[in-house]
Amino acid sequence: MEPRRMADSLRYVLMGTGPFAVPSFEAIRQQMDSTGDQIARVFVRPLPPVKSRGGPPPQPVREWAESHGLPVDAPASINDPETIASLTELNADLLVVCDYGQILKPDALQSARLGGINLHGSLLPAYRGAAPVQRALLSGDRETGVSVIHMTPRLDGGPIVASRTTPIRDDETSGELEVRLSEIGVDATREAIGLLRTIESLDSHGPLGEPQDPAKVSKAPRLSKAEAQIDWSATGREIDCLVRGMQPWPVAFTHTVVNENKPPLRVAIRGVRTETYAADASNIGRVMEHEGLAIGCGDGQVVIERLQPAGKKEMSGLDFKRGHRLTAGQQLIAP
């Protein structure tokens, strides 16, 4: 028997797969006793085929839902007729979508009385797409945030109902920033739900939120491994942003020549700091005079603090320098 619902309570369908969604979904679950709200079902992406090594990749939303006894569904397409029929039968008031991985078409959005809201990891309309957190770091942005939009069929294109802004820390990686933004997103999601709770129907209320400015739209496509290769002619800050933006995946890398008689060695770069001065272009990619492992770049040098050679454990730049007996002036970076 379902618990009695209050007059302004909401019946949710949650849609998400990755870790970014979990804090906001958990906040919704925790307030059900006080609000009379209900979670009708949780939709996640289907599990991919299991590869020969290891099990299926983690699905934090699935794990969270199952740990709390919530019903879970994983249709191949949220927009196929059978799934739409199932959604409609749930008689939901609101879809809450975050880190799901499928674009909802009009029939899916119209299955709930109030449509859907989506928590996105950027200050829209900047960085629409799959990698907003990473793209903000790679672009050298000093601040970012989260946005909650009232959903339309256009990817991340709906009007903004709530947002929160935060500075990007100088030493923050994409993984660390994403965790922090997921927590900041809880408050923005609550604000958006609070607004929708007072609405009887979308037809009677009219447009929700502030339309996005088309002139300020930028894209945030998925990262590729090729993008992670370091260009040592770039500035130190650009290299630092690349290293932080590419963690935890795909991880920035370079090819080093530690032995002229062997092929270049691929090395993952996991932590750097920069030292800027009037640079000499002839030093780009060379080992610099420094107590640690410093490499010449476009505007000075980058000190490599942590790295991981292919097939080896992570180590300090200094240990790598000592182990390969690198000397100042040596051309370390393969062209």
Curated annotation (Swiss-Prot):
GO terms for molecular function: methionyl-tRNA formyltransferase activity. Residues 203-222 are annotated as: Disordered. GO terms for biological process: conversion of methionyl-tRNA to N-formyl-methionyl-tRNA. Pfam families: Formyl_trans_C, Formyl_trans_N. It is an enzyme of class 2 (transferase). SUPFAM superfamilies: FMT C-terminal domain-like (SSF50486), Formyltransferase (SSF53328). One of its GO terms (cellular component) is cytosol. CDD domains: FMT_core_Met-tRNA-FMT_N, Met_tRNA_FMT_C. Disulfide bonds: none annotated. It catalyses: L-methionyl-tRNA(fMet) + (6R)-10-formyltetrahydrofolate = N-formyl-L-methionyl-tRNA(fMet) + (6S)-5,6,7,8-tetrahydrofolate + H(+). InterPro entries: Fmt, Formyl_trans_C, Formyl_transf_N, Formyl_transf_N_sf, Formyl_transferase-like_C_sf, Met-tRNA-FMT_C, Met-tRNA-FMT_N. The keyword Transferase applies. Its EC number is 2.1.2.9. Keywords: Protein biosynthesis, Transferase. (6S)-5,6,7,8-tetrahydrofolate binds at residues 122-125. NCBIfam families: fmt. Attaches a formyl group to the free amino group of methionyl-tRNA(fMet). The formyl group appears to play a dual role in the initiator identity of N-formylmethionyl-tRNA by promoting its recognition by IF2 and preventing the misappropriation of this tRNA by the elongation apparatus. Belongs to the Fmt family. This is Methionyl-tRNA formyltransferase. It comes from Rhodopirellula baltica (strain DSM 10527 / NCIMB 13988 / SH1).
